């Protein structure tokens, strides 16, 4: 039994090592190009959201609180706004109202969600390891325990079983 478990863990690690690294190029609030690959070296939470999205509004306070807790443990949080030109002006107000202190990138699209296998709707959250591999995804509004379980695993020694790599709250 122990050999089976060790073999399964080794296979999962080998697959992860061969998996392509996630990449995304957007703009920061000042219009400067920003790239996901430039943040490799520490675990990262990438949350796709929009100002017009009700579940995103409900989820954002959780992310803000978790960033305070896990940012101190080396986890980088990035918000990727799906707002288009007509709603983009609302982003600074949204960020101020929700006390968002982590970086927010502008110009995310449905193509970005698709390329990262995050479905076709927001909110959507990807958890990346320090090498840039997506190790977990939550499609739809995340629950606090789902976020914490993945963050604890990502920042821990990973000796226990990994959390479910996909949580899907959307149909």
Which residue stretches match the model-derived regions?
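Thiol-based oxidoreductase modules, predominantly thioredoxin-like and allied folds used
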Residues: 74-88, 100-109
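N-proximal helix/coil linker or "cap" segments that precede and/or mark the start of modular domains
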Residues: 3-23, 93, 160-171
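N-terminal "domain-start" segment that seeds a small globular fold
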Residues: 14-38, 102
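Short pre-active-site segment immediately N-terminal to redox-active cysteine/selenocysteine motifs
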Residues: 42-44, 48-52, 121, 131
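Thiol-/selenol-based redox modules, centered on thioredoxin-like
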Residues: 124-171
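Short, internal strand/loop/helix patches
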Residues: 92-128
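Conserved redox-active cysteine motifs that mediate thiol-disulfide chemistry
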Residues: 48-65
